[in-house]
């Protein structure tokens, strides 16, 4: 069929045919995950009693926004959380993570990055090196930072985590590979990191950066030892439809604590209008399991094709996928931090 629209060489068409054949079993597995998550989503919408009126937002202060509260109820049910903040005011994953960290930590507390250095946009938030200097980083507010590097094989150093967790207040786990060529951590690994830290320090809060990982499996990190998770609706849970926003979900007391940093101390979750965003947010979230499945199938196809032409992607197409990211070495020596400098993103 594709040759009716594009002038492709026979060798390319044969490569496409072979790639699709090799990916068949993996596609079927991803579709099983999709179907499970879609049924979970449908049950959440049904049990929470979502009605057409809940697609209408609010203006002004947004006090007593029943539709916003209904969205957070559905999200909590679907993700296995006691409570959640799902708001269009979150501008990116980094912004959402920042609100969560500033909400959980106080002066004198320690943030432990248990899975190595977080991706570079968080360096400015934490205050690593010169990043964010003078802008109100965690360290400038008296919060200590500790880090356990990954082992050479990109697996967590559990012995070091157990030692460093003794003095930690919050343990940070980054599920996705971010901008490194490691595999995303599966839920068993997240559970083991959480158990290791909690055994050393029962009072520690396990915080998982869930960006790029939602709906890639039938469970979420809250069922694997996490106390709080956070992510962006610009990515997986927005289904490519939700125009903006993010979420923080988990234990009710911790979400409540964070909500007072999201708005203002003493106000918490009660404030925040939704304007015209709710219909697209409900819609995007509902379709997210299917959209994530298609993103993963595209990734698997690309990974398989790259392997057939001699390039080694991370992960391999046969691997268990725990985020939607694919890495491969293009042979270029150019290296940009995120976000890419503006002069490098303009079309020429």
Per-region residue spans from a language model:
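Basic/polar N-terminal segments that are highly enriched at the extreme N-terminus
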Residues: 1-3
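Conserved PLP-enzyme active-site core in the AAT-like
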Residues: 5-9, 15-17, 23-24, 31, ...
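Generic structural marker for isolated residues within well-ordered, non-membrane alpha-helices
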Residues: 72
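Conserved glycine-rich beta-strand-loop-beta hairpin in the small C-terminal domain of fold type I
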Residues: 318-326
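Short glycine/threonine-rich loop-to-helix capping motif typified by GTGT followed
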Residues: 326-335
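Conserved small/polar residues in nucleotide/adenosyl-binding loops
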Residues: 336-345
